[in-house]
Amino acid sequence: AVFDTAFHQTMPKENYMYALPYDLYSDHGIRRYGFHGTSHYFVTLRASELLNIPVDKLNIISCHLGNGSSVTAVKNGKSYITSMGQTPLAGVPMGTRCGDIDPAIVTFMQTRLGKSAEEVDAILNKESGVAGVSGVSSDFRDLENASDEGNERAQLALDMFHARVRETVAAYAADLG
């Protein structure tokens, strides 16, 4: 079996560690794993071929965008940093996943809104992202159509998605030099 996280096992420690107590990593494996590895690996190999650059010399930013989205910086043909984390919830907003948010929002929803851990998890994974912002759909084609018809929330969802992808790509471009 090939695990979808395998490509990202080359990330340096400073890019996969979270700024949490070290024992959460050493004893419990809490770290950035990344996802869509098979896709990013394929893009890396194909870019190497198309650009006629040996894979071990290739520096690119790979974007896997859609209902599930991730961005990966590939340095010398290996995953250097990726936007998804311990779970696929992290990173840029997606169809129904929120992407990166202030972690205290979880506690706020539990203590101030009375949501259980399971309810918060469902909100963040299944009711957020471009679908949650737009109130229309997790399908970007539907959002484009709704935006073209004047739906401001659909346009906002698209604008938010584009902004987070741009800032992630820009940060990764700086990482690659």
Language-model regions, residue ranges each:
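Short glycine-enriched loops at secondary-structure junctions
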Residues: F3-H8, E127
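Phosphate/pyrophosphate-binding loops at sites that engage ATP/ADP/AMP, CoA/4′-phosphopantetheine
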Residues: A47-P54, V169-G177
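Short, glycine- and charge-enriched coil/turn segments that flank and shape catalytic ligand pockets
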Residues: L50-K57, R112-E119, A146-R153
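Oxyanion-binding "anion nests"
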Residues: M109-V136
